[in-house]
């Protein structure tokens, strides 16, 4: 079977795979016209944003739809700015847009790769802020009804790296636009690592933005130079009792208390202290500066990356008794699959 359309430039790992058909859409009407017939005929279909959260392990036996819709509109009332953003907008460029227009609240989320439409799917987050903190609503194309529907932030069922779009609406919805609500009374979020040195009464949104960009640029490789998907593993969440037990064995373990009493561990710390920082397996490796990032060292296949990920998961479990979970979607011949080799 021939797969004539290369996906190499459409995934940030730079994996060389192809697909049967590749279509770009720039409006909601185009999206409906393309996606609904494919869905109704049960043909394999993948809706792709920036390709920064995906690992292709095989050629894709179906149609890849790239969402390139653009547009940002802003309204306001006494307390909030309200933004409506089309799904194809670049996330980091949106962060820059808000700061340049004197709207704060997204600065902690600077330099997260990908598009706005992908952001709600895994409830993106960094440095103490998650999308759910500033999301107002999400609009999506319901593939069963063919209608454009809107969910409130509560209806999105957000949790850590999860949403209704990874649950009940998986493969049944295509996000078309996102609504954000940014408070005019700004409260800096400074609880995480490199932001703790700022003073809450003097720090500005631009200060936080620049620090986040600086830290991410130092630790995260440029995917144009070294293929990667950013953080490959979720930070595991364990019970307080399990954390106390681990802390007795590993006094320097990094953990963050959660509102429900659980503790979120730093997956990068676990990987590094399992001896895997800089580890290489075939053409894939654990990044030497940030152990949470897996990289394509040249000509890695999706299988190479999955093999390395499984090795990391097994090693961390052997050392700490903690099971890591991959963040990116794993795409096989006919659609999404599990992490395997």
From Swiss-Prot:
Keywords: Cell cycle, Cell division, Cell shape, Cell wall biogenesis/degradation, Cytoplasm, FAD, Flavoprotein, NADP, Oxidoreductase, Peptidoglycan synthesis. It comes from the Bacteria. It is an enzyme of class 1 (oxidoreductase). It is found in: Cytoplasm. Pathway: Cell wall biogenesis; peptidoglycan biosynthesis. The active site is at residues 161, 231, 327. The keyword Cell division applies. One of its GO terms (cellular component) is cytosol. One of its GO terms (biological process) is cell wall organization. Its main location: cytoplasm. Its cofactor is FAD. Residues 15-185 form the FAD-binding PCMH-type domain. InterPro entries: FAD-bd_PCMH, FAD-bd_PCMH-like_sf, FAD-bd_PCMH_sub1, FAD-bd_PCMH_sub2, MurB, MurB_C, MurB_C_sf, Oxid_FAD_bind_N. One of its GO terms (molecular function) is FAD binding. Coiled coil: none annotated. Its EC number is 1.3.1.98. It catalyses: UDP-N-acetyl-alpha-D-muramate + NADP(+) = UDP-N-acetyl-3-O-(1-carboxyvinyl)-alpha-D-glucosamine + NADPH + H(+). The keyword Cell division applies. Pfam families: FAD_binding_4, MurB_C. NCBIfam families: murB (TIGR00179), PRK00046.1 (NF000755), PRK13903.1 (NF010478). Cell wall formation. HAMAP family: MurB (MF_00037). Belongs to the MurB family. This is UDP-N-acetylenolpyruvoylglucosamine reductase. It comes from Shewanella oneidensis (strain ATCC 700550 / JCM 31522 / CIP 106686 / LMG 19005 / NCIMB 14063 / MR-1). The lineage of its organism: Bacteria, Pseudomonadati, Pseudomonadota, Gammaproteobacteria, Alteromonadales. The gene is murB.
């Amino acid at each position: 079977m021939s797969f004539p359309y290369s996906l190499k430039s459409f995934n940030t790992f730079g994996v060389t795979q192809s697909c049967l058909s590749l279509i770009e859409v720039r409006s909601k009407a185009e999206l409906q016209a393309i996606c609904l017939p494919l869905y109704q005929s049960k043909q394999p279909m993948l809706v792709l944003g920036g390709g920064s959260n995906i690992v292709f392990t095989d050629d894709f036996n179906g149609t890849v739809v790239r969402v390139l819709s653009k547009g940002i509109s802003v309204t306001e009332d006494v307390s909030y700015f309200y933004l409506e953003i089309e799904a194809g907008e670049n996330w980091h460029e949106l962060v820059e847009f808000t700061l340049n227009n004197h709207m704060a609240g997204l600065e902690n989320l600077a330099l997260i790769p990908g598009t706005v439409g992908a952001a709600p799917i895994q409830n993106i987050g960094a440095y103490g802020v998650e999308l759910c903190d500033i999301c107002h609503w999400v609009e999506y194309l319901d593939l069963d009804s063919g209608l454009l529907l809107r969910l409130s932030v509560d209806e999105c069922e957000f949790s850590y790296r999860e949403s209704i779009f990874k649950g009940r609406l998986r493969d049944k919805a295509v996000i078309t636009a996102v609504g954000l609500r940014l408070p005019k009374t700004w409260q800096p979020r400074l609880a995480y690592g490199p932001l703790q040195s700022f003073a809450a009464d003097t720090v500005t949104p631009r200060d936080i933005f620049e620090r986040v960009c600086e830290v991410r640029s130092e630790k995260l490789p440029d995917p144009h130079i070294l293929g990667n998907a950013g953080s490959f593993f979720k930070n595991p969440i364990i019970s307080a009792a399990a954390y106390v037990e681990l802390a007795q064995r590993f006094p320097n373990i990094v953990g963050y208390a959660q509102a429900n009493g659980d503790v979120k561990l730093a997956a990068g710390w676990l990987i590094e202290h399992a001896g895997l920082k800089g580890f290489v397996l075939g053409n894939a490796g654990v990044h030497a500066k940030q152990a949470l990032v897996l990289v394509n060292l040249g000509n890695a296949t999706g299988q190479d990356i999955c093999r390395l990920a499984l090795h990391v998961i097994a090693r961390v479990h052997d050392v700490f008794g903690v099971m890591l979970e991959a963040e990116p979607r794993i795409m096989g011949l006919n659609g999404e699959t599990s992490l395997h080799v």
